[in-house]
A protein has these predicted regions:
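Structured catalytic-domain cores with a bias toward divalent-metal coordination
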Residues: 1-216
Length: 216
């Protein structure tokens, strides 16, 4: 950290989801209204910004304590090349670099899709051990109490429902067909303006239609 982080003026930390867990493209950062971190997050252009507390020992925690603005970009799944996660990540990094004056501006300026800031998130967990049958997709808007999936034991003796604990957007989910009781299955982000968040995700997906040069 001392050899790299201490010499940085701005940081973007690139992450996938865990193994067998996928994430909707999102920015995680501790935001201060009008601060440099918030300006970076808005410039990046991910559909969701999660205003996340710092974790002790993390890169974000280390950098923030030294006054270095830092974003974490989370998208896709570990051990996978997901174009829908990689392309917006590359575009977002380039947008931030242009905003910082590290790169020249675009010849044909494109406005990034507007992002919505989530005011919190939580995981819906498996009620029992068994086989998971998801009922929603990544990026879906869900209502409090809505059915997210069913978990049934292989012999059909028991079945449990996984329901959303809040109105929100599914920003992460398990890809494993098997679930253990208490395992995190669906990550739900909460928004003050849920309609705007849903619209931001739709605009984001529309923006992924490749232009002649998908990166520049």
């Amino acid at each position: 950290r001392e050899q790299i982080v201490d010499h940085a003026s701005h940081i973007i930390d690139l992450h996938t989801g865990a193994i067998h867990r996928t994430n909707l493209p999102q920015i995680r950062a501790q935001l201060t209204p009008g601060g440099e971190t918030e300006r970076m997050a808005n410039a990046f252009g991910a559909p969701v910004i999660l205003n996340a507390e710092l974790r002790e020992g993390s890169l974000r925690h280390y950098a923030q304590n030294r006054g270095i603005p830092v974003l974490t970009y989370e998208a896709g799944e570990a051990l996978r090349f997901d174009e829908w996660a990689i392309t917006p990540g590359v575009r977002g990094v380039l947008r931030v670099m242009r905003r910082l004056g590290m790169l020249a501006g675009e010849r044909r300026r494109r406005t990034p899709p507007a992002a919505e800031i989530a005011n919190g998130s939580s995981w819906a967990r498996a009620p029992i051990d068994g086989i998971l049958r998801p009922q929603v997709r990544l990026g879906a808007r869900v209502a409090r109490g809505e059915l997210l999936g069913r978990v049934a034991d292989p012999f059909g003796n028991a079945e449990g429902e996984v329901r959303s604990m809040a109105d929100g957007i599914v920003i992460g989910m398990s890809r494993l067909p098997l679930a253990n009781e208490g395992e995190a299955l669906f990550h739900i982000a909460r928004f003050d303006a849920i309609e705007e968040a849903e619209s931001a995700i739709e605009d984001f997906h529309s923006s992924l239609a490749p232009p002649p040069d998908p990166l520049y």
